[in-house]
Amino acid sequence: VFRRPNIRLSISLPEPLFNIDQLSEARLLGIIISDKFNFTSHVNYLLTLCAQRCYLLKVLRQQGLPPRELNTVYNAIIVNILKYALPAWAGFLKADLTNTINALFRKCHSMGFYLKLNTVSELIDQTNKKLFKSLPKSEHCAHYLLPPPKSAIRSRRSTVLNYTLPTFKHKLYKNSFICRYLYRHCLNS
């Protein structure tokens, strides 16, 4: 049962069914989601995985892999696992988790694994732009999540987006990819 974390009602879970365990976390398409819609476990899992892969990069560097190839391997085995489904969970990142991921990037940069220093916000912007570029296509599987298009009203002000901005009551919806990106994009234009 997934629920809003700030809900004031106490929800009693149903009695466990025969041979079915009740879990506080679930792994859906490779992303660990808690029952309070928290991604801390997922980020901690990714950081553990990245630490193991940093050791592999260290061994490759000691065996004489040139910096350019080391950079390619770093992109493939560390940056890409952090980018996987990042738009879905990036809005729920807390400051301490963001700082921890940025510390990993700084460590990898200082060890010479990566030539350019990354930040979490750069990765989030890259993945958001890539996804939002493909969402307006009707063939995209998440196209139905977009808000309805704006009606054709004449205005002297040029707008970047032709979508109506959604209203939200709950923080969970506000942190979702589409709502977060639409508001950020409109406020910056």
Where are the predicted features?
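Generic recognition of well-structured, leucine-rich alpha-helical segments
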Residues: 35, 53-63, 80, 85, ...
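Short linear motifs embedded in intrinsically disordered, charge-biased segments
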Residues: 94-189
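Basic, alpha-helical interaction scaffolds
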Residues: 19-87
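Residue-level recognition of alpha-helical structural elements
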Residues: 39, 65-71, 90-97, 116, ...
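Short, conserved micro-motifs composed of acidic
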Residues: 1-24
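Short conserved micro-motifs at the rims of enzyme active sites and ligand-binding pockets
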Residues: 11-13, 40-43, 188-189
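Structured loops at beta-to-helix junctions and adjacent beta-edge loops in soluble globular domains
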Residues: 2-5, 31-36, 168, 180-182
